[in-house]
Regions:
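Basic, polyanion-binding surface patches
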Residues: 2-200
Length: 200
């Protein structure tokens, strides 16, 4: 079976330790059977530059077209799963399915995150993903939006004697690694890895 790209609207983190996420897919989608059979997939975060490709991959079926070829996207070999990521995406999250929940219009795939790859260009000085620099895209009610500026840090509403930056920008820096609790995360160079305790 060939690989495919599907645009998923319903997705999100569901557990910190072990790191897990979920995606919900209609049963009639071409990618549904691929994921159901292989029990793995890669989540690729999308950017402003990838918005047209994101839309195309949501309205065209892999039964009829090769989306990698049509959108000039590059398959990125994965570290832990056979499913490829998308090289043009700033973040590739490799997942293995642990459970499938039949809900209604969609089935929900619960999956453990087994590896994460992050483009070095979007890492800050602390080795964390710089959300502002990535210019990520979100989707709501049939429309695409870029994410806004940082508004604050978790806990800033009750913090004392610690100045908080509201709507500030993080400086753009390069790094060789990123971190996610319990999961090794590599930069594109793949030369360095490290682990760090995550935050809820």
């Amino acid at each position: 079976r060939k690989t495919d790209i599907i645009t998923v609207a319903w997705a999100g983190t569901i557990c910190s330790d072990p790191a897990m996420l979920s995606i919900s897919v209609r049963k009639n989608r071409y990618s549904y059977d691929i994921i159901k059979e292989t029990k793995e997939f890669v989540v690729n975060l999308t950017t402003k530059q990838l918005c047209r490709a994101t839309d195309y991959c949501g309205v065209r079926s892999g039964r009829d077209v090769d989306k990698f070829q049509e959108m000039h996207l590059t398959p990125q070999p994965s570290e832990k799963v056979k499913a490829p990521g998308i090289a043009e995406s700033p973040v590739n999250i490799e997942c293995r399915v642990t459970q499938v929940l039949e809900l209604g219009t969609h089935d929900m795939f619960l999956a453990e995150v087994v590896a994460v790859r992050v483009d070095d260009d979007y890492m800050d000085e602390n080795g964390r993903f710089d959300l502002n620099a990535a210019d990520l895209v979100t989707y709501s009610h049939g429309e695409y939006f870029t994410l806004g500026k940082k508004l604050g840090t978790f806990g800033y509403s009750v913090a004392k004697n610690k100045p908080q930056s509201i709507a500030g920008n993080n400086p753009k820096h390069k790094s060789k690694s990123s971190t996610k609790k319990g999961v090794k995360a590599k930069g594109r160079s793949g030369k360095h890895t490290r682990k760090e305790k995550g935050k809820k």
